[in-house]
Amino acid sequence: MAKKVIKVVKLQIPAGKANPAPPVGPALGQAGVNIMAFCKEFNARTADQAGLIIPVEITVFEDRSFTFITKTPPAAVLLKKAAGIESGSGEPNRNKVATIKRDKVREIAEMKMPDLNAASIEAAMRMVEGTARSMGIVIED
C-alpha cells in the first residue's frame, strides 16, 4: 500500500547551499522531517548548479520519510544571469536595465520547458520574453 502524504512543502533554495537555518529548518521541522538528511541529499543533487536558485517540492509521508523533486531555476534568475545584472528594473516600462539576444531567450526556454505548461518552444519563449519585459530587459533579434 502507498504511504500517506501528510504535507507538501515548496521552497526555493540556492543550489548546494541548503542548511538547517531558516527558511529550510522551520519549514521542514514543522513537518517532522530529518532536516540534515534533506540538506545533504539536496546539496549532493544540486552541486553542479552552483549559483542558481532551485525550486524544490518536498513530499512528507506519514512515517516522516520524504521525497523531493527539484525543478528548473526560475526564468527571472536565468535571465539575470544571462544579462549579467544583479536585479531587474524598478520601473520596467520606463528604464531598461539590459539587452539580451533572442537565441539566449530560446536557450532559457528550452531549459525551462519541462516545468512550463507550454505546447511548443515558441510558446515557452513568449513566456520567458514576458518575464524579461517585466524585468526591464530588452530582447533583440
Curated annotation (Swiss-Prot):
PROSITE patterns: RIBOSOMAL_L11 (PS00359)
Gene Ontology annotations of biological process type: translation
Gene3D superfamilies: Ribosomal protein L11, C-terminal domain, Ribosomal protein L11/L12, N-terminal domain
Any one annotated GO CC term: cytosolic large ribosomal subunit
Pfam families: Ribosomal_L11, Ribosomal_L11_N
PTM field: One or more lysine residues are methylated.
Keywords assigned by UniProt, alphabetized: Methylation, Ribonucleoprotein, Ribosomal protein, RNA-binding, rRNA-binding
GO molecular function per UniProt: large ribosomal subunit rRNA binding; structural constituent of ribosome
Keyword rRNA-binding among record annotations: yes
Function: Forms part of the ribosomal stalk which helps the ribosome interact with GTP-bound translation factors.
Annotated HAMAP family: Ribosomal_uL11
Subunit structure: Part of the ribosomal stalk of the 50S ribosomal subunit. Interacts with L10 and the large rRNA to form the base of the stalk. L10 forms an elongated spine to which L12 dimers bind in a sequential fashion forming a multimeric L10(L12)X complex.
Stated family: Belongs to the universal ribosomal protein uL11 family.
Official protein name in the record: Large ribosomal subunit protein uL11
Gene this chain is encoded by: rplK
